[in-house]
Every structure is written in structure tokens, then in C-alpha cells.
Amino acid sequence: MLMSDVEKFGGDCGSSGGSGRPTLKLGTRASTLAKTPTSTGGRTFMTVEVRSRKRKASGASPAEGVGYGTSPYTSDDNRQGQISRSATCSLTAREQLSRINAIHTADSISAQKEAAKKLRDEEEVEVAPPEGESVIDEPDSVKEPAAAADAVADVATPVLGDIAPGAAGTRPGRGGHDDKGKRYSYQGAGGKIKEKEGGGGVKKAAASRASSKHIKLDIENALSGTEERYVLMASSRRRGGSKSDRRISRDVVIPDEIEVKALAAAMAEKVGDVLRVLSHMGVEARQNTAIGSDVASEVAERFSHRPKVVSKIQMERELSDISDSGLALEPRPPVVTVMGHVDHGKTSLLDVLRKSNVAEKEFRGITQHIGAYQIDVDGKKITFLDTPGHEAFSDMRARGTNVTDIVVLVVAADDGVMPQTVESINHVKTAGVSMVVAVNKIDRSDANVDKITNDLLQHGVVPEKLGGDVMIVPVSAKTGENLDKLKSSILLLAEMLELRAPVEGRAQGVVIESKIERNCGVVATVIVQRGTLRKGNVVVAGDGSYGKVRNMFDDSDNSVEEALPSMPVRVLGLDKVPKAGDVFLVMPSEKHARDLLEHRAGINLSRGRDSGRNDSVFTGPLFSMDRPEGVNMILKADVAGSLEAISRSVAQIEHEEVKFNILHKDIGDVTKSDILLAEAASAVVLAFNVKVDAQARDLVRQKDVDIRHHRVIYDLIDDVKGVVCGKLKPIIREVQVGLLVVREVFSSGKGGTVIGCYVSEGAVSRGALVKIYRNDAVTCEGKVKVLRRFKDDVKEVGHGLECGVLVEGAKDVAVGDVIKVLEVVEHARVVE
């Protein structure tokens, strides 16, 4: 209920007519306040005229516009009635001020209640929870401040005629109430109305200050329109409090294991709040601590969310799912991988098919990178992958079979089936792909195709002419013989396989090779398996690489706008170098890409904790005194595939006395940080097809770091074996170079024993190591201290001569003993 505004105070309260009556101005709403002496006990009293402009008190009729009051313009009859009524409400000036303040306070509180109610009603209409989310109330502990704020609105509205018994004794000018739960209005130093709210929201110091100071109530400001603005401001603050009373309930996806900060982000809660809840649960954790799904679910429930536990496999499937449903499948070119033993002519065969000269550009004619090309054959496209034939590149060959449709196994007609040929056959069987055998070099005079066929039969490769399903095509890369037949065989097999893939939709494929180029950054060679890869797509590759495709190039270095299924392209724009063999996906946005990588990083972290090891970088101590001789190495290569092959080859060079520690391996040139690490750990830097950058060259000369450059993997592996051999202790052997027979024994005056001997085999020299045997048992061992021929000192005595020798430590010597002259020989150890 809203109280009437005070319109005017005035009139005369006694029998005098109104002249000489002092008035007190109260502003536009309170016009006059008359003070006049009366005849009743000489007591001063005032009369108040209250007019209602917009609102009226409950129970008043519309005609009631004037309340108690007197006026000099009223008639004598009416004046007598007004005087009689004013007698009942005649108050002192102090009491009138107290009553006016009470009216103002009640009016403000009622206005606040109505404004707050109106705002709450508007919120209920405007605020609606999103789909799948519900709005719930805060716990009681959160509602307490809002309840304390609303306590002011619950104060009973005072009526005009109610005055506390002690009101008459109130200090003049003291406005407001003494109850801390009410709202105080007083005039500050600047003349503005300030409000203080009691309860928990008012500090004790402020309350003490308000009670100790003599605060005058400025009636003009208290009843002016500025109060309405304060009411609205208070209502606005209350509206903000009402929003905090509500919380959004979410569906929180929780994996098998999740970090605390990730859980807080999923619930849209503060990390500190989550940690406090965990502490109350008895779980000591930090923001990077991983907690189980059961604990995370309980935390989510305590925040009134709905936990949904999913496995890591299921979450991976949901994040990386690319649905092909509803997409049309269209024919795609076959992906053909050329495999075989080293130097059997794989790259030369591809050069003839592509009409290129890749083999001439390769150092010493050896393929050490996997290559991807696409050619046109009779209007149809074929994608070829060229894999290295060296045994160190077995992982590359395995990746080739995993992304291919057809394998062309190249076997040299003059060399036959070799170890890498057999390995390639096993890869084909494991992958379950179709195969065509190309018997190359049939132009050689010693070519024997029938022998090749029989050798293949021993490894389970049955040709068509013997009832199998493998086509064998004799070809010559040098003369071009039967190349058309080989192309036709590939196209026929591809037609039989009915290769199809969706062209529309998000792209997915495999990383074939990756490297860092000086002017381009990270470059990844990929093959699209489905969908269309376009410039500007956000791509995730493997577990830690993502980015937006800035540019794409085909195998002829032409920039392309899009890549269709089975098309190999070089992609620029990734932030890190992906691993060869990683699967790449096109994601809807960078946020989706980061979410997928964070999930995969969490899986890898869990696997690392379970296994307790990290294969990428050596994390053990650099120096230790209680371990075998170690060789610290830093590997730098031009592409990811070569780095992988080198790491695998080095790991296979094992010896019980020497341990390899790969401190760091990376793609790109040797940098300053590599040199500093090599110096600190006394490491050998193996640089494969890379250079030393400008900043590191001067540092190499200063630090004297051992850097070994190689362009062929054969040489690198042999060099590593040489490093191992240099760390191994040599084999020490004693070789017999002479044999002496004791014929006389003389006692020397110096306390030694002079032995008269006959050299029956070889020779004896001064300083030689000798062992004295008696009945095949060693009685003494030492070096020849003195060697004489008759009375002359000599350096050496040969076969068939007599001599006298003095052996260090020889005392027990008898005639007939045998003295063997030995030579210590060190043999370097060889690692196979």
C-alpha cells in the first residue's frame, strides 16, 4: 500500500487569523509548515494539510482531497470543525518531523516492494532456460544475502496516526529508525541523500557512525523526486541478486579420467569452487590433477549438474565422427604402392610411367623418402606411392600398404627374391590388398622370369597361369617394354575392386610424409580418402597438430583449391609436424579441433602414466656412474619418415656394454639449442640431409661439437656402428712369438737369477712378456729385464741361438723349464 505524498503543511491552529505566523518551507511537495501559539496551555502545535495527487490511502473516497489542516481562507463554521479535528493531531515541531520521516520511509519501502515485484515478474517472462537445461534454486547458503536484502521490504508499513511512545523524546533532526534491519536516510556532507541497509550488509563502523552523529533530515531532498532514482537503483541491485539465485543445470560429459580444470570448464564453474568441493569430499587435488569418473560425477551432482559418463573410445568417436549417411558414393582413382627390394628399379619404373626423372635427382640413385604422384592413363587417373627399399624403411612400407588399394611388387629379373621382397609380401598379406608383380630388368642378359615365379611360389604368391589371383607382368623400365600391359593390369584390377568414396562432406585422409621447409613452415604430404579437402579448412592431424589449410600443391607443385578422394597434395598451415601415418580430419571449427586434441592428449597422458615411459625423448639422467658406457645422440632429419627410420635403426644397434640415449630428435636443420644440448651431454649429432643453420655454425667451432652429416642411410648406420665400436673395450690377446728352453741357472750377485736359454722358436727381445712353465703349469710371469748374448747386452736374440736372460721376479727356475715369449695384441670389436 502506497502512502500519500505530503502536499502542503499550513493553516492556523489557534483562534488568531494567520498574520505573523512563521512558516517552514518544505519544497514543492510540502509547501508550508505553520507554527503558532495556542491558548491551550501555551503549547506550540502545528497543523498539517495532506493532499493526494495520484495515490490515495486505502478506504478514502475519490472526493477526499484535503486532510487535516487550517487555512485563512476558510469560513468560520468550517474553521471550528477543523480546529476540533486538529486538536486531536496537534503535535510539536519535533513530533511532526518524526511523523514526516516515518511517512517518507514507509512510502519508500512500499515503492521498493512494488518495483522489485514488477522486475521479478518481468524476469520470469524474459528469462527462459535453453533447451536441455533447467533452472534450479541456489542452496540456502547462497540465498542468505538476498533474504537479508528482502527483509527491508517485509517491514510493516506505518500508518499516519502511529507514533512510538518515545517519539516525543527523539532528538530533533535525527531521521530514520534505530533498527539495524531498516533502511536509514540521512544527509551526508555533500547534501545528498545516502542510504544504508542494515543486517549483514551494514558494517559495524558505519552503524556506529550513524548512531553517534547528529544527522539532520533535509525534508526537501527526502520528499523530492531524487528519491525515486534511489529506489530504482536499489531495485536494479536487487534484480541482479535475483539472477544469482538461479543456476543453469547442464549435461556434463565425463570421460574415464578428467583433470580438475577440464571438469570446471565443462560445468562452467570456477576451478577454486571445484577444488573446495573436492576438499570437502576428502580429495586433495590441484587444477591439473586427474580424477576418476566416479569422483567427477559426484562433484557435478553437488553443483546440481547432470553427469554423463562416456568411455574414451566413445568420446573419440563422437568428436571425430564423420557420417557418410546420405552422401553419394562416386568412383575414385586407385592408390597404387610400388614396393620391393632396394635397387630393383622401383623409382625408374615410376619415372617411365610419369615421364619424369626423379631417380636421377636422388643421391646415388637411392630412394629414402616416400613419394606420392598422380598420373593420367587413357583418361583415367592412378595415384602412385613410391616407398624406399632399404630395410630401415620397413615402417614406410607398412604405411604404404595401409593406405593403398593395389601393390605393385617390383622384383629384379637378374637378382631374384630378396629379404625386402619377402617383407613386402608379408605387408601385403597383412593389409589384405591386391597385388601385381612387375618383374623388372628383363632387358638384362641374365634375366630369368621363370626362376622369379618359382621363388614367389615359395612365399605364397601364386600367379594366374598357375591358378592363382596374382598377375605377373615382365617389364623393362629401361626400354619401356610391356609398360602398357602393366597399366592395363592396374586399371583392370581397380575396376574389379569397384573403388568408391563420397566426394561431398568433411575430408579425411592419411599423412604420408611431413617436414619443415624454410619458407613454408610445416609441410605435410597427405592423401585424401573421402570428402573434399579445401583451402581454409581446419584440419587435425594425429595427436598434436592442427591448423587452417593456407595452401595446397599437387605433385607438380601447382597450387590447387581443393583435393578430391585419392589425390595426393602437400598441405601448408599446420602448427606442428605430424607423424607419418597420422590420420587427418577436417573439423567444423578450431574450437572442435582443440577439443579433440585435448581429449587425445589426455588419453596419451594416461597411457604414459600406465606405461611409465616416453619413447620420443630420453628423460633419464644425462650422466651416471653406475651404468654401462653410454652414447648420447641427437638426431636431426629432413622428413618425419627418415627420422623414424633412423631412430628405429639406431635402436636396433644394441650391445650389452654400450647404451644409446637419444636425447632429442626432430625435423629440420641443426640449431643453436641442439649444439648447446650436445655440448652439455657430450652427445654426437647425426644430421641426415639437413644443414647447420647460421646461428649454430660459429657455436659449433667454439664448443667443438661432433656433428656427422650423412645423405644415405647406409652410411649413417655404418657410422653409428663405428661409434659403438669406439666405445667398446678392445679384445686383448696374448700371442706367442718365441719359445726358450732353460739349460743353465746362475745365481747373480745382485740377488737375481740368470737363466741360460736356447731359443727353439721365434725370438726373444728385451722388455718382452714371458711366462715360465714347469709341467704345463706357470711358475713365474714377468718381463725380460736383461738380455745378453755372451757378455754383450743385446735387444733381441733370434731362433737357434743361446742367450742369458734375467726375468723380473723369477726365483724358482730349474733346468728343463720352458719359457714362452708373449706379445699383447688388442683387437677392435666389431658390431654386426
Curated annotation (Swiss-Prot):
Residues 340-347 are annotated as: G1. Keywords: Cytoplasm, GTP-binding, Initiation factor, Nucleotide-binding, Protein biosynthesis. Residues 1-87, 120-148, 163-201 are annotated as: Disordered. Residues 365-369 are annotated as: G2. Residues 11-20 have a biased composition (Gly residues). Pfam families: EF-G_D2, GTP_EFTU, IF-2. It is found in: Cytoplasm. Residues 1-10 have a biased composition (Basic and acidic residues). It comes from the Bacteria. One of the essential components for the initiation of protein synthesis. Protects formylmethionyl-tRNA from spontaneous hydrolysis and promotes its binding to the 30S ribosomal subunits. Also involved in the hydrolysis of GTP during the formation of the 70S ribosomal complex. This is Translation initiation factor IF-2.
